[in-house]
């Protein structure tokens, strides 16, 4: 059994029991001075699921163009997803009432398991959802060799 943190934007009670670390996440950008970059990094949340055939990673990247995202494998087994959410052009006559969408650079790293076929990684960005598929190598079944008994 594994524990997976899930969120539901449609649940009106989802924020009733807040994550105690959310406060920390909101304070850190203010202290470090890296507000928008840290916010963009925090918003690049990804799911990783394993199927019998592959490891599948998904990230919601609304408004990010394919040219603004990089998917790489470094050090032989580390999947790196990085990119930049560009800031909307501001007009000096505009009066902002709320800014909640983050902008800046983001990067996520995942150490892949031994069964990952890193030479066959595929990625696609459709409707603001990045999907990275890392096929798995076939598990070789241990060979059973019958030994003749003499005598």
Curated annotation (Swiss-Prot):
Q: Which domain of life is it from?
A: Eukaryota
Pfam families from the UniProt entry: HSP20
Q: Would you tell me the protein name for this molecule?
A: 16.9 kDa class I heat shock protein 2
Q: What is the taxonomic lineage of the source species?
A: Eukaryota, Viridiplantae, Streptophyta, Embryophyta, Tracheophyta
Name the protein family.
Belongs to the small heat shock protein (HSP20) family.
Against CDD domains, the record matches this protein to: ACD_ScHsp26_like (cd06472)
Molecular function as annotated in GO = unfolded protein binding
GO CC aspect terms: cytoplasm
Membrane-traversing stretches:
none
| GO BP terms | protein complex oligomerization; protein folding; protein homooligomerization; response to heat; response to hydrogen peroxide; response to salt stress
Q: Which PROSITE patterns match?
A: SHSP (PS01031)
Cite the InterPro entries for this sequence: A-crystallin/Hsp20_dom, HSP20-like_chaperone, Small_HSP
Q: Where in the cell is it found?
A: Cytoplasm
Q: What is its main location?
A: cytoplasm
Question: What keywords tag this UniProt record?
Answer: Cytoplasm, Stress response
Q: How does it assemble?
A: Homododecamer composed of 2 hexameric rings, each consisting of 3 homodimers.
The encoding gene is hsp16.9B
